[in-house]
Amino acid sequence: MAAATGAGAGPGRTTDWQIATVESVHAESPRVKLFRLKLPAGQKFSAGQYYDIRLTAPDGYQAQRSYSISSSPEKPGVIELVIELIPGGEVSSYFHEAVVPGERIELRGPIGGHFTWTPNYIEPLLLVAGGSGIAPLMSIIRRRATLDSSPRMLFMFSVRTEHDILFRQELERMAHEDADFDLTITLTRAVPDSWTGETRRIDAQMIDTAFDAATGKTRLREAGTGTPEAAKAAPNPPGQPFGRAYICGGTGFVESIASYLLETGMDYDDIRTERFGP
């Protein structure tokens, strides 16, 4: 995904252009490939950061784009980039059509500080992604999964079709195994008969429903039982169940979600946003 409006220098940023080597290429969906790159000198990064990528043609012409890291920072020296094929996109087309393992890629980073998450922030997290906007959020999700004690998390993911659900098996496994990880996936276009999830764009009602479900699970655990009666007897959680939100996707998508979260009472500084485009 092309990244980050308003992101500046962040933890571990290297401002010089360097060379990374492509270790593997994996087709995650019909329009998205995952590229695993080995960084120079075991470079470290934080969950939520991105790298600038630069291509240089034989005649000296250069094209540059920014791509978010989807891998966990627990594995320094290696990053995974989510690159969606954009019609007419110079950099994404080159990666999809020409890049193979062993190729050397020019990059700069890691970049970004406002959109990062580190384990010292322990309040419940809301993550919302549209399409390939899942990339930096996947890094946060994976980092959280490495912890012995981790904050409650709700991840809401909007995609066009079932084929566009990136990292589906990994996400569904986490949701099944981790009682503190809630997952909502919604399809906005082609919906197969077998689909049992949401089928529209993420809106206020969907967010409220997801909030209620996540809050209800918390109340049941606090009561020490799984009965509705115990849930009613448990202390009511605050009206806004999440301490911080991370939203990544197209501009309209991000602004719509952020505006509604402000209406629910979430503080402006606790709503972290990242927009992308071609």
Where are these regions (language model features)?
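Ferredoxin-reductase
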Residues: A2-E103, V159-T161, T186-A190
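Reductase modules of NAD(P)H-dependent flavoproteins
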Residues: R13-D16, M156-P278
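Short, conserved phosphate/pyrophosphate- and ester-handling motifs at nucleotide-, phospho-/glycolipid
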Residues: G48, G133, G250
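A short, basic/flexible loop-to-alpha-helix module at the beginning of a structural domain
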Residues: P110-Y121
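Conserved S-adenosyl-L-methionine
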Residues: I122-E123, R143-M153
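Structural motif
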Residues: P124-L126, L154, R244
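Histidine-anchored nucleotide/phosphate-binding helix
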Residues: I134-T146
